[in-house]
């Protein structure tokens, strides 16, 4: 049996139950474990509600309980430069970004990984619901977590082979309910702590209010695709493709009483397009173009791939054909898809394996670009 005590694992601890159990399991398996709390956002800012101080106290309590050293590291500058600025620039461009994908790529598995190496780490570990498997050639494959409802490979799709080689996901084979049970059995301070939701730097704040502190909103016209004026919108950045609600038009102006949805945007004219019906024809597309295409292992610069894909988190896989050219790809759907949203991640799968992904730039319907930006 191998001696794990000679293998140092640095665990990213958030003060939540998942990362607490991650540290506990590794400690029980005999690894040399160090806990590190990442402070990524200045919660003294009047708009940040990340409760970093409380979270750090929870990390300290759990680390003391399981008997591991712990540190706090400040990544506020890196987070602002690499994640938050990206988040703002995407909204400014009329897109709907996914900051979690960028945070994993740039902070948790880059800045944190680099820091862990200065502590003499052999590996880093996080509480993500995903699995890593090493094949006989030493290549690491990233697989979905066994808890379908919690699988987080969508958010980890930009990780590189180099990053995966140094990563452990001890919760990947567990259900969330089992993780809670382990925490309760061990009497961990975080056993009953509520899971955090939403974007870290917004916390419980009103999203519109938060965004308007950084980007001035430009009101404009809300129109149907056939040119009827439906009133005023509050600013294009507040709306996402396929969104229902928050439009202020209810069932009015329509003969069929179907709900209204955001079906398009025109950034150059500052127009928000709305239409009735969940499957409104303007919401349906047959292909997309993506950039920042990235695979979790080395691939040729040009190739074609038949696989499945997700276009948003918690969505069933759809069959696609991917035509890759360097960092760009065209993704053609077997069946038309609804509300393909520029700025969101498209993530590729081969059965249980997450192959990688990219960021959606444009959607097309039978070769014609959808008016989504």
From Swiss-Prot:
Entry EC number(s): 2.8.1.13
Location of the region described as Interaction with target base in tRNA in the Swiss-Prot/TrEMBL record: 98-100
Active site: 103, 200
GO CC annotation, single: cytoplasm
Molecular function, one GO term: ATP binding
Region (Interaction with tRNA): 150-152, 312-313
Binding annotation for ATP: 12-19, 38, 127
Pfam family, one: tRNA_Me_trans_C
Intrachain disulfide bonds: 103-200
Enzyme class: transferase
A Gene Ontology BP annotation from the UniProt entry: tRNA wobble position uridine thiolation
Annotated site, Interaction with tRNA, chain positions: 128, 344
Protein's job: Catalyzes the 2-thiolation of uridine at the wobble position (U34) of tRNA, leading to the formation of s(2)U34.
Family of the protein in this entry: Belongs to the MnmA/TRMU family.
Name by which UniProt lists this protein: tRNA-specific 2-thiouridylase MnmA
Organism of this sequence: Streptococcus uberis (strain ATCC BAA-854 / 0140J)
């Amino acid at each position: 049996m191998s001696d794990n005590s000679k293998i140092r694992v640095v665990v990213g601890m958030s003060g939540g139950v998942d990362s607490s159990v991650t540290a506990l399991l590794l400690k029980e398996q005999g690894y040399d474990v160090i806990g590190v709390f990442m402070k990524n956002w200045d919660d003294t800012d009047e708009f940040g509600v990340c409760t970093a101080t409380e979270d750090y106290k929870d990390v300290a309590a759990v680390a003391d309980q399981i008997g591991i050293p712990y540190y706090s590291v400040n990544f506020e500058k890196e987070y602002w430069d690499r994640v938050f600025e990206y988040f703002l620039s995407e909204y400014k461009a009329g897109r709907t970004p996914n900051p979690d994908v960028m945070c994993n790529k740039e902070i948790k598995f880059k800045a944190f990984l680099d820091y862990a190496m200065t502590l003499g780490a052999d590996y880093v570990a996080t509480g993500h619901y995903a699995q890593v498997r090493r094949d006989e050639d030493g290549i690491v494959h990233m697989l979905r977590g066994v808890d379908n409802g919690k699988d987080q490979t969508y958010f980890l799709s930009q990780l590189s082979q180099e990053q995966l080689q140094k990563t452990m996901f001890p919760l990947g084979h567990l259900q969330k309910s089992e993780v809670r049970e382990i925490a309760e059995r061990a009497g961990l301070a975080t056993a009953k702590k509520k899971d955090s939701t939403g974007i870290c730097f917004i916390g419980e704040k009103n999203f519109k209010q938060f965004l308007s502190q950084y980007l001035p909103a430009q009101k404009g016209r809300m129109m149907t695709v056939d040119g009827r004026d439906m009133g005023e919108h509050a600013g294009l950045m507040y709306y996402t493709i396929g969104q229902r609600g928050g439009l202020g038009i209810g069932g009015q102006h329509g003969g069929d009483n179907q709900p209204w949805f955001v079906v398009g945007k025109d950034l150059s004219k500052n127009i928000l397009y709305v239409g009735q019906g969940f499957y409104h024809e303007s919401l349906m597309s047959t292909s997309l173009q993506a950039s920042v295409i990235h695979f979790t292992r080395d691939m040729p610069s040009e190739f074609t791939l038949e696989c499945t894909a997700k276009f948003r988190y918690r969505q069933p896989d759809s069959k696609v054909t991917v035509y890759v050219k360097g960092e760009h790809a065209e993704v053609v759907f077997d069946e038309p898809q609804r509300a393909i949203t520029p700025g969101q991640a498209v993530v590729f799968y081969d059965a249980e394996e997450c192959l990688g992904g990219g960021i959606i730039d444009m959607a097309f319907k039978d070769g014609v670009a959808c008016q989504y930006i």
